[in-house]
Amino acid sequence: AVVMTRKEIELLCYLLTHRGQILSREHLLKNVWDSNGFVLERTVDVHITHLRKKLGQYGKRIVTKSRYGYLFSV
């Protein structure tokens, strides 16, 4: 069984809902994280890294688009 944090699940669901679309770190922070608090953009990168590891071979579907953000490839 794969154990994920609530935020990892929320991020994965958001990526899946918007699969095929490039989503910037800023966009992900606004839509997945609580915008009331201060959150660093690096937080997205860390969560993406954890998701990729936990998804194993399927983690490769989360693609980094340099200087743009991330997308879940279909």
Regions found by a protein language model. Give the residues of each.
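Alpha/beta-hydrolase active-site loop signature
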Residues: G69
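C-terminal edge and immediately downstream basic/flexible tail or linker adjoining helix-turn-helix-like DNA-binding
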Residues: F72-V74
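Positively charged, aromatic-enriched patches within helix-turn-helix-type DNA-binding elements
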Residues: A1-G59, T64-S66
